[in-house]
Regions:
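Class I S-adenosyl-L-methionine-dependent methyltransferase catalytic core
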Residues: 1-261
């Protein structure tokens, strides 16, 4: 399992200007009888930076079609990539754009306050993106980021959720450039996903369902990378793990898909 720590550098400081913006605060719930606020999950800049530098080059076009508080977008721009982003939360779009303009002024970026599933702005385009990297919402509406019914975070049914993910992946496949295994040219779609446990229904691993969708769309699973997860709610479910005889899930999965001819 790969481990990423928060590095105190300029990129981290830039990301914090967005993640700590009061306009974007959406606490998941409160604990300890309402005295301790538990915030929604926040990405590590070093995690984003590693994937961006490993799978793309300076000047490449990198896209995140569910960018939230913009960690992938900011890391890509910071490392000299052109960036395209989509988010349905207007505050997210404005705050990330402001951070780009203020702290990475020479960056080339197109941020859209629109649906990252359909990506209507590029419906006539194809083979234009060097790297897709996203961190889509968890299944079963685990965390709520806005009230837009088009957002995956508001889709409580699995069939509806994965139906929209399939549409998203179909559009990403059209927009991503073609890879060539023999020539060592890789233009990946990287999707970071997790799992949810639902009592008697057991463990629901998003990677399994998304791999099946990828296979259906003739996308090749090029790699599967596990990284350490440090969930905010971890300490609150330790007793349950012992009582119900399951283990704590402290990892997420990054699925790396590519498109071959």
């Amino acid at each position: 399992i790969m481990k990423f720590d928060r590095k105190k550098d300029k990129l981290n400081d830039i990301c914090r200007t967005v993640s700590h913006n009061e306009a974007l605060r959406r606490p998941k719930k409160t604990a300890l009888f309402g005295t301790n606020e538990v915030s929604n999950y926040t990405m590590l800049p070093e995690h984003s930076r590693w994937f961006i530098k490993y799978f793309s080059n300076e000047g490449d076009v990198c896209a995140d079609n569910s960018f939230g508080r913009g960690t992938n977008i900011l890391a890509a721009a910071y490392e000299g990539r052109k960036v395209i982003g989509f988010d349905l939360n207007k505050n997210n779009v404005e705050c990330v754009r402001e951070a780009l303009d203020q702290y990475i002024p020479n960056s080339e970026h197109e941020l859209h306050h629109s649906c990252g599933v359909e990506m209507e702005e590029y419906k006539e385009a194809s083979n234009m993106i060097d790297l897709f990297i996203n961190d889509i919402p968890y299944i079963l509406s685990a965390e709520k980021y806005n009230d837009d019914p088009r957002d995956l975070c508001n889709m409580k049914g699995l069939d509806e959720f994965y139906g929209r993910v399939e549409v998203m992946m179909k559009n990403m496949k059209r927009l991503i450039k073609t890879s060539n295994y023999e020539d060592g040219v890789f233009k990946p779609i990287i999707m970071k996903v997790g799992s949810q446990r639902r009592g008697k229904k057991g463990l629901m691993d998003m990677a399994t369902d998304i791999e099946m969708i990828g296979r259906k769309l003739n996308l090749t699973l090029h790699d599967k990378i596990f990284n350490e997860l440090r969930p905010n709610m971890q300490s609150y479910i330790i007793n349950t793990t012992f009582k119900k005889r399951f283990t704590m899930k402290i990892q997420e999965t990054s699925l790396v898909f590519v498109k071959y001819v």
